Amino acid sequence: MVSQLTDAFARTFYYLRLSVTDVCNFRCTYCLPGGYRPDSHGAKRFLSCDEIRRISHAFAALGTEKVRLTGGEPTLRRDFCDIVAAVRENSAIRTLAVTTNGYRMARDVGAWRDAGLTAINVSVDSLDARQFHAITGEDRFAQVMAGIDAAFDAGFGRIKVNTVLMRGVNDGSLQAFLHWIRRRPIQMRFIELMETGDGSELFRRHHVSGATIRTQLLAAGWQRRLPGRSDGPAQVFWHPDYLGEVGLIMPYEKNFCASCNRLRVSAVGNLHLCLFGEQGIALRDLLQEDAQQAALQVRIAAALRHKREGHFLHQGDSGHTQNLSFIGG
């Protein structure tokens, strides 16, 4: 039996990003500007709670320590708390996180924590309510801010906030974000805009390197923090005068893929070795019975033989990723 997921480049995989739906109720300009549209084959049958439980059990047995539930908007699923509880059945999973647009946080975050959720990432691309509305297509800024407060009240000690960095949109907002996190335990994460199949023109207009933010941080006395083995790819910076931190995710940086530690499973049960990779390796046929666990683990481990050393974004190759709701970014 395979005991640990390792690829041909000696990278070990402790982190699973598990999409539970493609559906999202926001219309973010960099992801789903026209809103969610079912494909021509009709409504997809997303992974059931039992299938998710079997996936998480297999990955936990293969050394996974961290699972992040993604989408789409994962909290739109009516059984979201059941999904959280199913993943938390695995004691080897030390961190169970969600990436959310925050739409339901104010109402439901306490229930998520009670079910076993341990970490939250919230997408907030602007601290200006009008600009937030323009980016997301939803006038929900106050609601999302209330949700962040509710998460702290529910007992989450630190929250991560994701901001997609866009030239001419929010790249001049660093000081506003830093002021916001000065007395709040928030890790502010600036994510470089990435080119996808549907977003090439947006990328050409708005991409800006996260290095511009890094230069400003270092000049202001911020210091780099070393990552843990199940952390994501962010370069994290701290400052003694701030409760919050800043993370930079820069996929176009040299050697970005050298420390890759995550795999992805789509909402229909395909294993993706890279966000910008192949069409995926089907797992769903091995998710129907608990007795299939050994075969499932063997298939997952065998797939790693095909993982490439890096992506090809610099050549404009985004693989089969049409938009970031497809396998959860």
Curated annotation (Swiss-Prot):
Q: For binding [4Fe-4S] cluster 1, which residues are annotated in this chain's numbering?
A: C24, C28, C31
CDD domains membership: Radical_SAM, Twitch_MoaA
So which domain of life are we looking at? Bacteria
**Residues annotated for [4Fe-4S] cluster 2 binding in this entry:** C257, C260, C274
Cofactor(s) listed: [4Fe-4S] cluster
Task: List, in alphabetical order, the GO biological process terms annotated in this UniProt record.
Answer: Mo-molybdopterin cofactor biosynthetic process
Pathway annotation from the record? Cofactor biosynthesis; molybdopterin biosynthesis
User: Which Enzyme Commission numbers does its entry carry?
Assistant: 4.1.99.22
* Residues bound to S-adenosyl-L-methionine: Y30, G72, S123, M194
Protein name listed in UniProt: GTP 3',8-cyclase
Which species does this protein come from?
Answer: Edwardsiella ictaluri (strain 93-146)
